[in-house]
Regions:
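Conserved active-site and cofactor/substrate-binding residues in soluble primary-metabolism enzymes
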Residues: 11, 15-18, 35, 90-93, ...
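Glycine-rich phosphate/diphosphate-binding loop of Rossmann-like nucleotide-binding domains
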Residues: 196-309
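Glycine-rich, N-terminal phosphate-binding loop and its surrounding beta-alpha-beta segment
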Residues: 42, 49-124
Length: 479
C-alpha cells in the first residue's frame, strides 16, 4: 500500500468523524432535555471491531498472499450490512469509514441493519476469472471462520470491483461450508436473480439517486435555496464516473426526467455535449473500448471538468474527489453525492459558505442497501415478491373495470385498461418500495433542515436524524 492511499483513507475517516461530531453538537443544542452524552457518542462513533485477514492462494506455480478487511461499526441492529470492495488501494481507515457511513445510512432510511464494510487488496484486472474465483472463495472461507459472513450476523454486498458474479461465488462457498443452513443464500445480497437475487438490485443505487433528486425538486422551499427553477426537465448534469451507479443515475435522469447529461468524466477524459449525451451509447462504447476515448465529444480534460458550468453535479466514483483545492471553483448550485464520501469535510465547509446545496451520500446513495434489505427479506421468506398477490390484484381491477364499463355502456381504451389491471411484478414492487423509502426519508431530512436552527445544511440534518436513531436504539438496549 502506498503512503498516499493510506493518507486518503485516514482523511476520509476523519471527514466521517467530523460530520458525526458536528451532528452530536447540533443534537445537544437542539434537544436540551435529551442530551447525547460523550460516552455514548464515543461508543457510536468508533468501530466495534475490525478484522485483518491474510491468506495464501497458490496460483501460477507460486503462493500469493492476499490481505483483506472486514470492519463492524455498530451492532445496534443485526445483521450488520455493507459491501466488499476489490481494489489495490483498500486500507483499514477507508473500510472503517465506510462501515460507519453504512450505520448512519441504514438508520437514516430505517433499514434495520448495523453498519459493516469489507475490502480485499487486489486489482481484479490482473487476474483471470478462474483465478479471481479461487481468491474470492478463499477470502469467503476466512470471513466465514469469524462469522463475518452469515445471514443473521454479517451480510456483505457488492461494492467497487465486485458485482453479481463475486456475490454468487461467495454465497455458493458459504453454502458449501454450511450445507445445513436453510437461509444460506441470505448470507450476501446483490446476487444474480437466478441465485436468489432480486430484480432491480443492480440499478438500485443509481435509481435511488434519481428518486432522491425527484424528492428534492418536489420541495419548492428547498429548491429555492439553490436558485434553480422547479423540475428536473432541462437541468444540465455533470456525472463523474460512469460505473454502475453513475450509469444508472445518468440513464434514468436523461430518459425518464428529461435532464441533459452534458458532461461525463472518466479516467481517460471527458465527454461533453451541451445538447445531452446518449448515455446508453456511451456505456456501450466504454464496454467495447475500455474507455471514453473515441466517443463523440471526447476531450482530454479530466477532473478539472468538475468545475464546468451546469445545474447538478453527481460525483459517482470514489471518495474525496472534491477537496479544499477545487471546492472554490465548483460552479453547480446543487451537488448530489452518488459515491461514498466524495466531498471532504474541508470542501464541505467551503461549498456551504458559497451557498451550494449538497444532498449527502448517507441519503443519496442509500438505494443499494434498501434493495439489499428487500433481497434479504426475499431470501428469508423464500418467495418472490408479488407471487401471492399479483393475479388477485389483476382480478380485482378487471372486475372494477367491467363494472364501470357496464354502468357507462362504454369500453375503456385497451392500453389504459391493460395498464390499470396489470398486477405489480417484482421489479415494480422493488421500485415502489425504494421510491417510498427515498421520499419518506427526504421528508424527515427536509423538515429538520428547515425547522431546526442548528441544521444549517442537508448533511447536518441527515446526520442528526441518523445519530439520534442509533442513540435511541442503544438506550433501549440499556447501553
Amino acid at each position: 500500500m502506498f503512503l498516499g492511499e493510506k493518507m486518503a483513507g485516514d482523511a476520509f475517516l476523519k471527514s466521517i468523524e467530523s460530520n458525526f461530531q458536528n451532528a452530536v453538537r447540533c443534537l445537544n443544542a437542539t434537544y436540551e432535555n435529551d442530551q447525547l452524552g460523550e460516552d455514548l457518542a464515543t461508543k457510536i462513533m468508533v468501530a466495534n471491531s475490525t478484522y485483518v485477514v491474510r491468506f495464501g492462494v497458490r496460483l501460477r506455480g507460486q503462493l500469493f498472499t492476499f490481505t483483506g478487511y472486514r470492519s463492524v461499526h455498530s451492532e445496534h441492529f443485526e445483521p450488520v450490512k455493507g459491501g466488499i470492495r476489490f481494489a489495490p488501494d483498500v486500507n483499514q481507515d477507508e473500510v472503517e469509514a465506510l462501515a460507519a457511513l453504512m450505520s448512519y445510512k441504514c438508520a437514516l432510511v430505517e433499514v434495520p441493519f448495523g453498519g459493516s464494510k469489507g475490502g480485499l487488496i487486489i486489482d481484479p484486472r490482473e487476474w483471470s476469472e478462474p483465478e479471481l474465483e479461487r481468491i474470492t472463495r478463499r477470502f469467503t472461507q476466512e470471513l466465514a471462520k469469524r462469522d463475518l459472513i452469515h445471514p443473521s450476523q454479517n451480510v456483505p454486498a457488492p461494492d467497487v470491483g465486485t458485482g453479481e458474479r463475486e456475490m454468487a461465488w461467495m454465497a455458493d462457498e458459504y453454502k458449501r461450508l454450511n450445507p445445513a443452513e436453510l437461509n444460506a443464500w441470505a448470507c450476501v445480497t446483490g446476487k444474480p436473480v437466478s441465485k436468489g437475487g432480486i430484480s432491480g438490485r443492480t440499478e438500485a443505487t443509481g435509481r435511488g439517486v434519481e428518486y432522491a433528486l425527484r424528492a428534492f425538486f418536489d420541495h419548492p422551499r428547498d429548491v429555492a435555496k439553490t436558485g434553480l427553477t422547479p423540475g428536473l426537465k432541462g437541468k444540465r448534469v455533470i456525472v463523474q464516473g460512469l460505473g454502475n451507479v453513475g450509469y444508472h443515475a445518468a440513464l434514468f435522469l436523461s430518459t425518464e426526467d428529461a435532464a441533459l447529461v452534458t458532461h461525463v468524466l472518466e479516467r481517460d477524459g471527458t465527454i461533453v455535449d451541451e445538447t445531452g449525451i446518449d448515455i446508453a451509447a456511451l456505456r456501450t462504447h466504454i464496454m467495447e473500448n475500455g474507455g471514453v476515448t473515441g466517443f463523440p465529444g471526447h476531450v482530454a480534460s479530466g477532473m478539472e471538468m468538475l468545475e464546468a458550468e451546469a445545474d447538478i453535479l453527481i460525483p459517482a466514483a470514489m471518495e474525496l474527489v472534491i477537496t479544499e483545492d477545487n471546492a472554490p471553483n465548483i460552479r453547480t448550485p446543487l451537488i448530489i453525492e452518488a459515491a461514498n464520501g466524495p466531498v471532504s469535510a474541508e470542501a464541505d465547509v467551503i461549498l456551504r459558505e458559497r451557498g451550494i446545496v449538497i444532498i449527502p451520500d448517507l441519503y443519496a446513495n442509500a438505494g443499494g442497501v434498501t434493495v439489499s434489505y428487500f433481497e434479504w427479506i426475499k431470501n428469508l421468506s423464500r418467495i418472490r415478491f408479488g407471487r401471492l398477490q399479483r393475479r388477485a390484484e389483476e382480478a380485482r381491477f378487471n372486475a372494477l373495470i367491467d363494472g364501470i364499463e357496464s354502468m357507462l355502456g362504454k369500453s375503456f381504451p385497451h392500453d389504459i385498461a391493460a395498464r390499470a389491471v396489470d398486477g405489480g411484478t417484482e421489479i415494480d414492487l422493488v421500485r415502489s418500495g425504494l421510491e417510498d423509502t427515498m421520499r419518506n426519508s427526504y421528508e424527515v431530512i427536509s423538515k429538520v433542515w428547515n425547522d431546526e436552527k442548528m441544521a444549517s445544511d442537508l448533511r447536518t440534518a441527515a446526520m442528526m436524524v441518523a445519530v439520534r436513531r442509533i442513540a435511541q436504539s442503544y438506550q433501549t438496549l440499556g447501553i
